[in-house]
């Protein structure tokens, strides 16, 4: 059992190598320099090579970004989305990736793929030559689990914002031992109006570029969007939201494992993981407090929910229900592809985790509101009668 009370048996992933591309390889030169400057260039000596390499790549990205602006700038500006997006939301490690991959089986929907998200500044002009070259260095599996990875698979649009130089809580992964610099961007609730408009403009620009590529209604998946429903509805009044949730006793250890692995692979520091457990506990509360505050704002018929456990047990039934509740059209369009997808994943192996009883009690104490709302059994042999509702003023670095 590790010091954070989580014992992990990992399946899949990959072994890190210096030449493996990083999340930040698509950022422009000045965007990258700003992130390092914001953290006072506190780079570990052993990670100096990574910092220099990404800096050099940043020059190349800046050049390609200029080319894309010259070639596609006006077209992107005048492009309209086919329809307001469909947002798949939920906490990290709750099944958002699985649900995203199911939705994009529908040929009527488009999505931002991994290349677009990791090269958002120039993917329209560089994909044809750069994606195959860099693809030779890419791992075949995601670093955190047994899910396949390649440039054409759907990806979190939050990484696109990071690489566009927009502040994001994900950028804290680069300097995991430093105080958070972009905490407010998890919920967007306390972001100055000028910066919020910049965020909206960058996000919409990216979605327009994706629309040029796909020509379809876009399905997006990003856990931070769970906290941003108010802003997203301001931008996209007809947006649909699909919220997936999962047993907290499965979410917590998997999230700890996620941030530990990503900090180890993607950081310019050697992470010490101090305070990680508290960040995960607090961020979960922040996320669902923001989600519940925004829930009444969502018009009827624009939000549907599904549990990870139900989706895995009977994906066809649950997907058909989601289509019906959100009025997404004829489910028969997707049914054959969904059955094939399910068959292909029949041998999928998940990571396994063991939780120390003391950690289970702490999770039950801090997240009791979630256990009760979604009907998950609380750990036994623990008196939770006096467990408080999570503070609405809590603030912590997003995990």
Question: Model regions: which residues?
Answer:
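PAPS-dependent sulfotransferases, especially Golgi type II membrane carbohydrate sulfotransferases
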Residues: 1-62, 66, 76, 184-189, ...
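N-terminal signal-anchor transmembrane helix
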Residues: 66-91, 117-121, 126-127
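Glycine-rich phosphate-binding P-loop
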Residues: 88-105
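Short His-Asn-centered micro-motif
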Residues: 89-91, 219-223, 308
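Post-Walker A helix-loop "phosphate-sensing" segment adjacent to the P-loop in P-loop NTPases
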Residues: 105-115
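PAPS-dependent sulfation machinery
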Residues: 118-218
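Conserved phosphate-donor/acceptor-positioning beta-strand/loop module used by diverse small-molecule
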Residues: 221-222, 232-257, 322
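Flexible loop/turn segments at secondary-structure boundaries
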Residues: 226-229, 249-252, 312-315
């Amino acid at each position: 059992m590790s010091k954070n009370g989580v014992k992990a048996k990992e399946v899949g992933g990959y072994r890190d190598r210096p030449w493996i591309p990083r999340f930040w390889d698509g950022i422009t030169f000045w965007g990258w320099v700003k992130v390092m400057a914001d953290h006072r260039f506190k780079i570990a000596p052993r990670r100096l090579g990574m910092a220099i390499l990404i800096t050099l790549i940043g020059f190349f990205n800046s050049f390609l970004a200029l080319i894309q602006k010259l070639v596609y700038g006006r077209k992107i500006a005048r492009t309209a989305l086919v329809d307001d997006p469909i947002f798949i939301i939920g906490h990290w490690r709750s099944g958002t990736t699985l649900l995203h991959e199911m939705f994009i089986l529908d040929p009527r929907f488009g999505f931002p793929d991994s290349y677009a998200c990791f090269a958002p500044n120039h993917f329209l002009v560089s994909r044809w030559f750069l994606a195959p070259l860099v693809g030779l260095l890419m791992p075949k599996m995601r670093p955190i689990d047994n899910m396949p990875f390649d440039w054409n698979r759907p990806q979190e649009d939050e990484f696109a914002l990071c690489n566009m130089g927009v502040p994001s809580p994900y950028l804290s992964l680069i300097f995991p031992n430093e105080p958070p610099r972009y905490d407010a961007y998890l919920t967007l609730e306390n972001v100055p109006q000028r910066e919020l408009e910049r965020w909206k403009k960058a996000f919409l620009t990216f979605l327009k570029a994706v629309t040029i590529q796909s020509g379809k209604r876009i399905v997006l998946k990003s856990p931070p969007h769970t906290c941003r429903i108010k802003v997203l509805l301001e931008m996209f009044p007809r947006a649909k939201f699909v919220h997936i949730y999962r047993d907290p006793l499965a979410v917590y250890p998997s999230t700890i494992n996620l941030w530990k692995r990503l900090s180890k692979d993607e950081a310019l520091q050697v992470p010490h993981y101090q305070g990680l457990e508290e960040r995960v506990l607090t961020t979960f509360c922040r996320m669902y407090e923001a989600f519940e505050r925004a829930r009444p704002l969502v018009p009827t018929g624009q939000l549907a929910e599904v549990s990870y456990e139900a989706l895995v047990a009977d994906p066809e039934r649950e997907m058909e229900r989601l289509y019906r509740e959100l009025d997404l059209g004829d489910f028969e369009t997707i049914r054959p592809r969904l059955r094939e997808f399910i068959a292909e994943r029949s041998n999928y192996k998940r990571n396994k985790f063991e939780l120390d009883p003391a950690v289970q009690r702490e999770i039950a104490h801090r997240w009791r509101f979630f256990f009760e709302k979604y009907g998950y059994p609380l750990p036994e042999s623990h008196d939770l009668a006096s467990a408080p509702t999570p503070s609405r003023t809590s603030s912590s670095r997003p995990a």
